[in-house]
């Protein structure tokens, strides 16, 4: 999963009259909380490493990501990064496509937008735009999805990653269960979150 270093920066999206806050970097880059209430900081910049399959991640998480993949593969699990860093434009395209799909099913524009936002993060609120979150899929020629997701759930914290959107925390995160979405927070924090069975929002509250 070797790669090359690239650079990128984030441009604040036009948010109209939406009430929002810019996510705080007070607790460090690895603990930036991005969700529907907290948008990516306007001046956020990221140095990217390109993986062998063309996906990109923040260079700071690359060593632990590689370590995690090496460990999984050594135990016979086949997995790969399906999604890494996304630009603002790419996130907007995903949203537009999801809205269009619902409209094609006969939903009104407002209905389609509301439904789409249950599945796709509003541009400016996606952790993929930080570069420190990855969607991990199974190489089904080697492992089942369930086996890979189970391994990740039980072991990702050892490498600094957390399952960002657990099924029992939807009311807090505002996002449905995503067993493939892992976010880097650092090994110490990831172990705390894992052992306590909490989500990132709850952990950040303990720091306030």
Model-inferred region functions:
Residues 1-208:
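Extracytoplasmic cell-surface/polysaccharide-interacting catalytic and binding patches
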